[in-house]
């Protein structure tokens, strides 16, 4: 069994004065016209499960206009077990409680992880490599309590290294010290992200085959030392990308050595550009369909299939690693998917995690699905401020 959300309470959160949605089942469909606060409910759930918001707002913006504080609460159940997640937003700060005891965002994440799917995610395949790294990192911080530390320690070393490079320094004891720190923390972050991507992709292939059996999906995790130039990244055939060493064969020391070696090789280029050109902030994750780079050659439908499969595989991987089903948050994606992809998505959610879906149109769902769903129609009279 896994924790399930049974009710949501919002007070002075975004545009909501007071909202309570309870008696929630395994599938919750939130339906209503645009700009009535559907996405705000999804954001609140993410804030109370992942400890973050995909909107990345200043926290003051989540508080209703003219109010000093905002408040959101989830009630969760697992059999006879009851859990309450609460966040209080005040100014640019937020504080969490679980069953009345103060918790950090990282401590909150272990109770009920979430997987979020928004229309912006559908651009993930052709977006910049930083977006794909962010997507994997967002999953990783929920799977490992140590991952945020890995990332922050690397970012600190990277900032210091960049400051020295901007000052024209690429040698000497001070630079060598931060270069070593950059390699040590970079190796840890790279290996953790690479291993997660490897496990995620192994699940993606099975799901993809069920949706597009006539196509072969491949992927490459391309660490920074394998990305020799932008020209190489433009190549569309998978055979033109050297197969990196299998992740299970790489050690931290191997990656450290590669990063330090690349640092020496790129010293002139880094001094010219004033930034670090090596490290996990430059790693790439590329997908291929029938051997061709999906970013360059796949149709929009094929690219969206990859993203859909990545999200569904994330749900399965969370369940495998944490032993609990995450809550799946789908914000207005049904309108962006064709009938085949909607069918694949609804077939998945019928037998998997608790799911919250926002939509403007119930016609995207079969009568059978709606018969088993909790349908919440918004706006609900008296719950929102009339600005």
What is the role of each PLM region?
Residues 46:
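Helix-to-loop junction immediately C-terminal to a conserved catalytic motif
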Residues 1-33, 173-184, 188-327, 336-340, ...:
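Conserved NTPase motor "head" modules and their coupling/switch loops across ABC/AAA+ ATPases, GTPases
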Residues 49-131, 135-147, 202-206, 262-264, ...:
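Nucleotide-state sensing region of NTPase/ATPase domains
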Residues 38:
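Conserved lysine of the Walker
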């Amino acid at each position: 069994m896994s924790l399930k959300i049974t009710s949501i309470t919002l007070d002075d959160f975004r545009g909501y004065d007071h909202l309570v949605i309870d008696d929630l089942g395994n599938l919750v469909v939130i339906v209503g016209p645009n700009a009535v606060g559907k996405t705000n409910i999804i954001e609140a759930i993410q804030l109370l499960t992942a400890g973050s918001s995909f909107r990345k707002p200043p926290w003051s913006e989540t508080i209703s206009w003219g109010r000093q504080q905002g408040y959101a609460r989830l009630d969760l159940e697992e059999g006879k077990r009851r859990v309450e997640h609460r966040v209080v937003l005040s100014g640019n700060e937020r504080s969490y409680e679980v069953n009345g005891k103060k918790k950090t965002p990282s401590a909150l994440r272990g109770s009920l992880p979430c997987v979020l799917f928004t229309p912006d995610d559908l651009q993930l395949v052709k977006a910049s490599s930083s977006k794909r790294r962010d997507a994997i990192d967002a999953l990783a911080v929920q799977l490992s309590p140590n991952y945020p530390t890995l990332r922050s320690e690397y970012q600190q070393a990277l900032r210091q290294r960049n400051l020295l490079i901007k000052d024209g320094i690429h040698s000497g004891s001070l630079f060598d010290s931060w270069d070593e720190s950059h390699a040590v923390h970079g190796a840890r972050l790279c290996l953790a992200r690479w291993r997660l991507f490897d496990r995620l992709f192994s699940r993606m292939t099975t799901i993809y085959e069920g949706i597009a059996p006539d196509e072969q999906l491949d992927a490459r995790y391309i660490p920074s030392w394998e990305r020799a130039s932008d020209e190489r990244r433009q190549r569309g055939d998978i055979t033109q990308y050297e197969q990196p060493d299998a992740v299970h064969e790489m050690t931290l020391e191997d990656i450290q050595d590669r990063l330090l070696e690349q640092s020496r090789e790129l010293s002139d280029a880094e001094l010219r550009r004033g930034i670090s050109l090596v490290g996990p902030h430059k790693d790439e994750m590329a997908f291929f369909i029938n051997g061709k780079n999906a970013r360059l050659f796949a149709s929009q439908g094929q690219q969206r299939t990859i993203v859909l499969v990545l999200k569904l595989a994330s749900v399965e991987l969370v369940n495998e690693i944490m032993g609990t089903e995450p809550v799946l948050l789908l914000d207005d994606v049904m309108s962006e998917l064709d009938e085949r992809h909607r069918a694949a998505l609804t077939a998945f959610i019928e037998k998997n995690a608790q799911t919250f879906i926002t939509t403007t149109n119930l016609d995207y769902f079969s009568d059978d699905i709606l018969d088993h769903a909790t349908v919440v129609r918004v706006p609900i009279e008296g719950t929102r401020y009339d600005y």
